[in-house]
């Protein structure tokens, strides 16, 4: 037994920043961004916190599933841009929506929602819980260097959620990790110890090696999809729809070509 999706919900801030808007901040233009990244606009929070967005997505998922918050057995939140280190986003979502179940956070960046689904499937399959809320929220605008056109054009803010229940809706899954800190890094500065002797990084925003990110993303996306299809016994012509991570238009096209 794996799981089935009972309902989904999403939320994006109303404020939209276009490519033309970004051209007033950095040396770029709509044509450059559209051709290289495939993004024309992004939703950016003006007032919503990470938890605000997560709550709205969670409430919409619950409504779509037709269940109330007090029927949830577990909440798994995924984020790398939480409002606080503690309490976690999951704990604050639990409080805000009126749930009474355990809640915790996972931090796996772009792939966080997939890791959370797999984690939820484990809880459901061993019979520990019947209904699990998975919610992912990121307020990337708060950790972006808005003078770096290599990153500020890519990211936006928003949240997505799904309510999972017992069932056999999942045919197969495949996760992978390539550890390292040389491609994409988001340092944090919270060390106040007077005895800590290591140098503290002055970088506090997203630092990305675009070329290496592109190479890894194409490899990871295409290889993992092929491995997943093989484990599921599915051929390319059997697949009706692929919903990829949408950070970069060229990555998606190249991965599609390789598949």
Q: How does the language model describe each region?
A:
Residues 1-47, 148-215, 219, 223:
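Condensing-enzyme catalytic core mediating Claisen C-C bond formation in acyl metabolism
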Residues 5-7, 48-108, 235-252:
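Conserved beta-ketoacyl condensing-enzyme motif
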Residues 10-11, 78-83, 108-113, 136-141, ...:
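Acidic, glycine-rich active-site loops and adjacent beta-strand->loop/helix elements
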Residues 16-17, 86-88, 144-147:
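Short acidic, glycine/serine/threonine-rich loops at helix termini
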Residues 28-29, 50-65, 216-231:
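Short, well-ordered amphipathic alpha-helical segments that serve as non-catalytic structural scaffolds
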Residues 34-36, 40-52, 79-132, 256-259:
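Conserved catalytic cysteine-centered active-site region
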Residues 125-159:
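Flexible, glycine-rich active-site loops centered on histidine and acidic residues
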Residues 200-259:
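A contiguous, well-structured pocket-lining segment that forms one wall/lid of small-molecule binding clefts
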């Amino acid at each position: 037994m794996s799981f089935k999706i009972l309902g989904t919900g999403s939320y994006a801030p109303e404020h939209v920043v276009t490519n033309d808007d970004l051209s007033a901040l950095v040396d770029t233009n709509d044509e450059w961004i559209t051709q290289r990244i495939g993004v024309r606009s992004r939703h950016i929070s003006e007032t919503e916190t990470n938890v605000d967005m997560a709550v709205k997505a969670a409430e919409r998922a619950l409504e779509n599933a037709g269940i109330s918050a007090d029927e949830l057995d577990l909440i798994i939140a995924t984020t790398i841009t939480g409002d606080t280190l503690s309490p976690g986003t999951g704990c604050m979502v639990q409080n805000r929506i009126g749930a009474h179940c355990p809640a915790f956070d996972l931090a796996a960046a772009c792939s966080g929602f997939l890791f959370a689904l797999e984690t939820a499937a484990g809880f459901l399959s061993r019979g520990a819980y019947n209904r699990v809320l998975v919610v992912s929220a990121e307020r990337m605008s708060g950790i972006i260097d808005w003078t770096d056109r290599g990153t500020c054009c890519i990211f936006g803010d928003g949240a997505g959620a799904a309510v999972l229940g017992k069932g056999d809706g999942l045919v197969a899954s495949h996760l992978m990790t390539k550890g390292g800190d040389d491609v994409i890094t988001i340092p944090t500065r919270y060390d106040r110890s007077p005895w800590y002797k290591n140098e503290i990084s002055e970088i506090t925003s997203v630092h990305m090696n675009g070329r290496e990110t592109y190479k890894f993303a194409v490899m990871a996306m295409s290889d993992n999809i092929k491995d997943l299809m093989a484990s599921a016994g599915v051929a390319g012509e059997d697949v009706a729809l692929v919903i990829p991570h949408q950070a970069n238009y060229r990555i998606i096209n190249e991965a599609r070509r390789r598949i």
